[in-house]
Amino acid sequence: MSPQTETKASVEFKAGVKDYKLTYYTPEYETLDTDILAAFRVSPQPGVPPEEAGAAVAAESSTGTWTTVWTDGLTNLDRYKGRCYHIEPVAGEENQYICYVAYPLDLFEEGSVTNMFTSIVGNVFGFKALRALRLEDLRIPVAYVKTFQGPPHGIQVERDKLNKYGRPLLGCTIKPKLGLSAKNYGRAVYECLRGGLDFTKDDENVNSQPFMRWRDRFLFCAEALYKAQAETGEIKGHYLNATAGTCEDMMKRAVFARELGVPIVMHDYLTGGFTANTTLSHYCRDNGLLLHIHRAMHAVIDRQKNHGMHFRVLAKALRLSGGDHIHSGTVVGKLEGERDITLGFVDLLRDDYTEKDRSRGIYFTQSWVSTPGVLPVASGGIHVWHMPALTEIFGDDSVLQFGGGTLGHPWGNAPGAVANRVALEACVQARNEGRDLAREGNTIIREATKWSPELAAACEVWKEIKFEFPAMDTV
């Protein structure tokens, strides 16, 4: 060891283990406009003070490690460290705390959701001093938002491309999700689009399996949507799932979709990964493709109330990474979603500015500085009787997607699509006339059945179907 190294070590370095809170708990800290702010729900192990637990989260997700290291002296840790700056107990929960952590912007690569999540929700989630840890919300500073392209096109550009205004868009996931041949799959697409839907959709499971290879599916679906367009005079789309085992194969599928001239492709952004999603999003903007995002695997991450990551964080990450639609729950269908919480992250997807509102689970005020908005997609266990509630809850800037609620119609696929389109048009007209959809919804649907035998048949089939379970996702 050189004399210079010996002097440095003996004067400034003291080996050993220090409490995290001595360095990373800074209640006097005033956050900067450029900081990324995180709200963690922390459940410490018995005997671990909340200050130490919050400081440990800040340390392990930024510059800290389990022991003092001499290389700390080679940089300015005060500039780069995360700081736990506020802690509050969770009302009604024993030994749970919301710990607020501020991260300097220099810790993160520009335009990379992958890098942001690798730090903030990385190894710290396996830390032994914590029984559980959940990331409830993030404040993305304007300076960081502007390093991302965001959604390929956004809500207004999509409406202009489709020439459809003043109502929610209607979709349908083709069922059965697996097992159909490409030609039969295309037939179902055609029947649904001809019946009045705006979109049909590949199920998230559909990639390129032995029973239906991706190229065959793309060709038959393109033929179906062009035929439906010619017969209805409306622009139609089918979400062609470009998700693949490699980024190269994913891009090959997106390029082929563009060559076919279709308006939209699809990606499973969590299973596919944020790097792949951002790559595809950039391609879609450059080549005029809309991008539909499915959130398969989200409940593995977000459903447990005390561990993981809330979907509002995944939604913000998607708006940065890029997507024009994303599935967001229904409030009224078969999948998880409490109304105020769901509308909280729906607003985060669509609006340019969202105020802090803890009653809706929004921990931070968020500005998107004109980043395009994302259309929320309501999908999962919904049918014509849900149409008034969906129209009232989600408003015009949404996609209402009925899979079984279209293809399960007793008369077939096209009548199922007709029933949904008639129900939607009736609800939009009633709303525009000043009627209360929440109170008069069933009456509005019954009135519309007089003019649509397809809707009457659908109402009869699904009149008793309900999914009534308590929501796990509460404030």
From Swiss-Prot:
Keywords, A to Z, come to: Acetylation, Calvin cycle, Carbon dioxide fixation, Chloroplast, Disulfide bond, Lyase, Magnesium, Metal-binding, Monooxygenase, Oxidoreductase, Photorespiration, Photosynthesis, Plastid
Q: Which Pfam families match?
A: RuBisCO_large (PF00016), RuBisCO_large_N (PF02788)
The coiled-coil regions, if any, are none
Which residues are processed away as propeptide to yield the mature protein? 1-2
Identify the domain of life: Eukaryota
Which GO cellular component does the record give, naming just one?
A: chloroplast
GO molecular function terms noted in the UniProt entry = magnesium ion binding; monooxygenase activity; ribulose-bisphosphate carboxylase activity
Subcellular location per UniProt equals: Plastid, Chloroplast
Modification N-acetylproline, positions:
3
Swiss-Prot/TrEMBL catalytic activity: 2 (2R)-3-phosphoglycerate + 2 H(+) = D-ribulose 1,5-bisphosphate + CO2 + H2O; D-ribulose 1,5-bisphosphate + O2 = 2-phosphoglycolate + (2R)-3-phosphoglycerate + 2 H(+)
Q: List residue numbers at the site (Transition state stabilizer).
A: 334
Query: Where along this sequence does the record place binding of Mg(2+)?
Result: 201, 203-204
So where does substrate get bound?
65, 123, 173, 177, 204, 294-295, 327, 334, 379, 381, 403-404
Cofactor list:
Mg(2+)
Task: Report the residues modified as N6-carboxylysine.
Answer: 201
Q: What is the enzyme's main class? A: lyase
Q: Cite the EC number.
A: 4.1.1.39
Active-site residues from the entry: 175, 294
Q: Which GO terms describe its biological process?
A: photorespiration; reductive pentose-phosphate cycle
| Modification comment | The disulfide bond which can form between Cys-247 in the large chain dimeric partners within the hexadecamer appears to be associated with oxidative stress and protein turnover. The disulfide bonds reported in 1RBO may be the result of oxidation during crystallization.
- What functional role does this protein have? RuBisCO catalyzes two reactions: the carboxylation of D-ribulose 1,5-bisphosphate, the primary event in carbon dioxide fixation, as well as the oxidative fragmentation of the pentose substrate in the photorespiration process. Both reactions occur simultaneously and in competition at the same active site. Binds to abscisic acid (ABA) which has weakly inhibits carboxylation and more strongly inhibits enzyme activation.
One further remark on this entry is: The basic functional RuBisCO is composed of a large chain homodimer in a 'head-to-tail' conformation. In form I RuBisCO this homodimer is arranged in a barrel-like tetramer with the small subunits forming a tetrameric 'cap' on each end of the 'barrel'.
Tell me how this protein assembles.
Answer: Heterohexadecamer of 8 large chains and 8 small chains.
The protein depicted here goes by the name Ribulose bisphosphate carboxylase large chain
